[in-house]
Amino acid sequence: MPFVNSVRGSFGSQGRFGFGSGLLISSTGGTITTAGSYRIHTFLIGQSGTNFTASGSGSVEYLIVAGGGGGGWGASSYDGNGGGGAGGYLSGTANVSGTSYAVTVGNSGTAGTKRTSGDGLGYGGNGGASSVFSFTAFGGGGGGTDSYNNNSGLTGGSGGGASCSGSSANNPQFSGAAGTVGQGNRGGNVLIGGGGPGGGGSGGGGAGSVGGDGTQNSNGGNGGSGLANSISGTSLFYAGGGAGSSWTNSGGTGGSSIGGNGAARVPAINGTAGTNNRGAGGGAGTSDYLSGQGGTGIVIIRYAI
């Protein structure tokens, strides 16, 4: 398991784990900035495959966030679909020596495409994994679609939300997909399947909470909340879930204002993408209104100077 010596949460002003000082000052890799008494290496998707090369031995802090899952999209009227799960979230400390460490940053999960009956294309895609040292954060799970066979989302760092098939009175409850222990949370559930128009899909899970549930004749479920972290020198939210969509009501709101919002027919709005470089999930689509892709991941390493 890649969670040894990892801590989920924020790095505040008292969280100076590093003792690197002058031993690490010549380290290379990523975009290098300073904030106060810290030197910070930031790796984004365009830098995937590059290395962090430590110039000496010391302790560093890290934040690893995978790519968020894309929102689900169906074709049928009345159906709300599931928001994408956030990318997996890991933070903690690691001891490094004077060597090079491969860094991978996860890409965004693709938005679900408008499916036709039985083609299986409506699911949002899973985000890509991010990794450094011996730790891997798994990509967020794609949001569920109104497939009428399995409306649940896909598993991932945080799981995708489920779709509500509001046009059929015989559809059962559907569960949000599971997240990875230590990295995220499950997607929301659909509490009532079918029985009338206006089913709301559930939100994708976030690093801070499960996705919001969807019900018949409801708004789409909100995306699960992300977690705030100040490792970059500024407190920012990462890994918020994407929101579910609704046919006759409002789409849900993305988690921590970084997850994508869910689509709705009234008012006519598309689902939106998760925020890039934050690993946020994409918002779900509904019928003629698009779903959003997930946000790209990020890896940040810092040490005291």
Predicted regions and their residues:
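Low-complexity, glycine/proline-biased repetitive segments and flexible coils/loops
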Residues: 2-305
